[in-house]
Amino acid sequence: MLANINDNSTLVQLIDMRGINTSRMKNAHHMFWTKEGLTKHIDLSEFDTSNLEDAGYMFSTPYETVSTAQIDPIDFSHFNTSKVKIMTGMFAGSYLPSIDIRNFDTRNVVDMQYTFAGLKNVRHLDLHGFDVSKVNNIGAIFSGNSTLVSLNLANWQLDSIHAMDSLFAGMHALTDLNLTGFTTKNVTDMHHMFTECHALTTLDLSSFDTSKVTDMNNMFRDNFALKNLNLSSFNTSNVTNMKEMFRHDGVIYPLDVSTFDTRKVTNMDGMFYWTLMSPENATLDISNFDTRSLTSALGMFNYTKAKTIYASDQFTVNNVAPHPHEMFITNTNLVGGNGTQYVWPNNSSQYAHIDAPGNPGYFTRKP
């Protein structure tokens, strides 16, 4: 019913839904979507959505649309979503200046894929308290949001979600991300979850349950401004892939991975690549790392400016292939516990052990 009513328009000044009986409407898929232009004002003050089930792409705009037109925010205060199941792409690519949907009832929603992807002008999005307990698809829900500054997802209970890969990736302007009470207890995949959040300085993940996660590769990569990262609740007992997990996170300090269980991890390639750049001469404590399953650690510590790496005898490279292979490149500040200083070309896995007389290495036994 009423799908694509705005299709092929240019710049419509007003869509006034007053006087139209929509009380029996179940499907509004692509209803206000347009591929040619924008709508200046949409009046939904008497819009009856009490039976609406499908709001997919309802207010969306194609990502490739380019416009300098100024449009008005939509008043959603009377928008009834109690029966809505589909919100796929609902606001994808939207030019709305703001989206206030704090009154939305999402208890029956199952699909939120692309719901807020590619927003062009929205800087603040408050979704705290949404009932997302039935949602089973949040793929790329926030993808391409390069202008969003703050995002509040407090108390999201995502118990039906198994994959959160790339969930917040590419949110370059984001400085405030509230994940208090955000649950992840059934998630198995978190790869690239926070990649390229360039402006984020603080990230508190203390509510995360990661006990079922197997993939954390590139999880925090390229977070250039991130200084404070709370991983205190992290259970990594089932993780097998930590490749480039903290790559280019140069200002996180301290980088506390003391809760990590690494007994099943097979890949640590570039895990600490270009980390601990500031302050220089810092300490990296991986004394809890048990690397019995490790098969690849190529470039694991490349370019870090750490002076001390605490480790234990449980850190072993016996299974890496090929062995030896390069693990330390330009670690010019690094000094082992017996005084062995990093020098080129001594950059291989042969030095990935505790420094001792007659057996030079780059690690230090923790006091």
Regions found by a protein language model. Name each.
Residues M1-P367:
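Negatively charged
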